């Protein structure tokens, strides 16, 4: 019964929409017929005569005031429309007309079957948009104490936003904690420390966690049998406490490396112990997963310390060993650290081998992958590339491959070329990036600009070809060429990730809609006419009459501004300027 009633209501609604769409002319004539029949009871003739009498008694000042008021209201609407467009990227009037008025006027098709058939496609597109707007951990992130804090001490600016640091706190809680931490006092303290917002409170908690292990060893060793002293001495210190101190308290990379080496000793012992017990239950399995994340993080940061201190070959070896030992942990994106270190060594063959493994269609792309591939292609032809010669003879096969690789990279992240070509100033990269966004472009260019400068002619080739990408994708938000359409959410997320003193790069550039430009011009022109008419009523009347005469005369082809002003002078009978009189001294 309920289904029948619902079907009847839907059918009635569709009939009403159909009648409104196609029979509005009939309704209009019916209204006119009713008005004609009721003209005597409604006293339409008397009302019309009263209205005409009222209009005849109006003075020109009323029309000037009316025009000025309408211009003021239009200007306010224009200002509101411009503000709404700057904030939300769309026209308010257009959005209201499309979202609310169009359904009322029958502009929405009632095709529930099509909607149900396309539900799978919509879910796929939604899933893609979610993955495109996902915030990723920056694999090349800097050290807070040794790099970010030193920048703050020198410039007085905060390079990290609260949103970025909050995401890092969530990552630390995910990687470095587990459900069994409350059983160990040091881990319980560190579990609270990762949630602490104040940096000094986090550092104090890390020191407290290390002191608890010291006190426990001093108190328990004399009280137990000698057979268990060996086990107590093997109890590791808190590895995560050393990680926090290395990240936030160490003021130099060398100090951070020392603390990470101490963390490695503690973390390696915990990892080996939990590896033996991981099959004893879900609790031990979660603990082993946590210890694995801690160990991988420590080794990766040690490799980054070696890279910062100039020991690049040692860093490459550590990264390769880490990728062989833990091949399934792709969340840290260690291959991007490896690519940057290999480029520093100018080991381009090894870089190509890494790209062959990770530049796969089934794997997520990044600016590092796409632009490194473009750099290798450009390196083969950039030293001999000349725009003038290419325009005369055309592009060779190698040059075409390099240009296509650059177009592919620019389509993935269009913000990078401005930083590589130094058209925009660089800032310290954030701890998290958004794929295809301005934050990823900053993180890539911050470390790879030197590699592009080292390849002769690479930046020249990029400068000559990167803008050609936009001709291939005229509507990047709707359809891409090699990748999915450019996500709309990048600007909003980048503004949260990047500091306020940085001007976020926006792609594509938001152009003002024609409605706003037309309204602005119309309001300005109307306001100017109203002001001139109020100040010079006679002159403007003659000017309007002269314009009408010119437009409707046979001399329309030969009119010019001089003829207009001659007509105005004739109508006003402006006397000639008086001659200067000379009086005798």
Swiss-Prot record:
Chain segments annotated as transmembrane: 15-35, 62-82, 512-532
Subcellular location: Membrane
Carbohydrate attachment residues: 47
Cellular component terms (Gene Ontology): membrane
Record keywords: Glycoprotein, Membrane, Phosphoprotein, Transmembrane, Transmembrane helix
Transmembrane among keywords: yes
Organism: Microcebus murinus (Gray mouse lemur)
Residue numbers carrying Phosphoserine: 386
PANTHER family: SUPPRESSION OF TUMORIGENICITY 7 (PTHR12745), SUPPRESSOR OF TUMORIGENICITY 7 PROTEIN (PTHR12745:SF10)
Family: Belongs to the ST7 family.
Descriptive protein name: Suppressor of tumorigenicity 7 protein
Topology class, membrane: Multi-pass membrane protein
Pfam families attached to this UniProt entry: ST7
Principal subcellular localisation of the protein: membrane
